[in-house]
């Protein structure tokens, strides 16, 4: 639960974030809390035999329904369904709660608010990354952080996939390795936790 000063601070920070999204030309998108499981693909689940284990899901008649795990999967579904109506470069932001079916712990929540923005379409990746870095930096500065109080990391999944391929990791283990790498900087994991996953 959040109330009083903590909730007011959260609302104030989210307003700063949203104002910066708008200032940088991003349009708002709101998606349902529930998605049809087959529309959102698989997640980075610990249990490879049950790739949807990290999401809250249930059956609605004959369909598997899940609570929104992140904001990227609903964006992918939205773009696929509305591609004909979208501009060549689609800049969208979303600020909504997401849900994780995992053990709650220090800095790990089953429900939390995610603020997300993406640039989709015919765009130069370097330009898009530069714009997003500028947006992040200006937002953090407006939230009263100083430049020596934050670091912006840019990662590219294709680079990691290329390294995995160069290391000749078998196809059957590549997904597990990607999942482990994804956990590297998460609280409570670190190098030892990643080694245990592998």
Predicted regions and their residues:
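Extended, charged alpha-beta segments that form solvent-exposed binding/catalytic grooves
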Residues: 1-198
């Amino acid at each position: 639960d959040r109330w009083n000063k903590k909730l007011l601070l959260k609302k104030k920070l989210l307003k700063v974030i949203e104002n910066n999204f708008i200032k940088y030309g991003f349009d708002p998108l709101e998606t349902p809390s529930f998605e049809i499981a087959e529309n959102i693909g698989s997640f980075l689940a610990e249990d490879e035999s049950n790739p949807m284990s990290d999401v809250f899901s249930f059956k609605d008649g004959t369909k598997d329904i899940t609570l929104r795990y992140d904001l990227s999967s609903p964006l992918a579904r939205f773009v696929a369904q509305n591609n004909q109506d979208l501009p060549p470069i689609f800049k969208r932001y979303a600020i909504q709660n997401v849900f994780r079916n995992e053990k709650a712990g220090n800095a790990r929540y089953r429900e939390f608010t995610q603020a997300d923005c993406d640039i989709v379409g015919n765009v130069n990746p370097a330009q898009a990354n530069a714009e997003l870095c500028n947006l992040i930096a200006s937002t953090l500065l407006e939230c009263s952080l100083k430049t020596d109080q934050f670091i912006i990391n840019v990662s590219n999944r294709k680079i990691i996939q290329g390294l995995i391929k160069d290391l000749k990791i078998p196809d059957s283990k590549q997904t597990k390795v990607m999942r482990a790498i994804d956990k590297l900087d998460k609280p409570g994991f670190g190098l030892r936790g990643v080694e245990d996953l592998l």
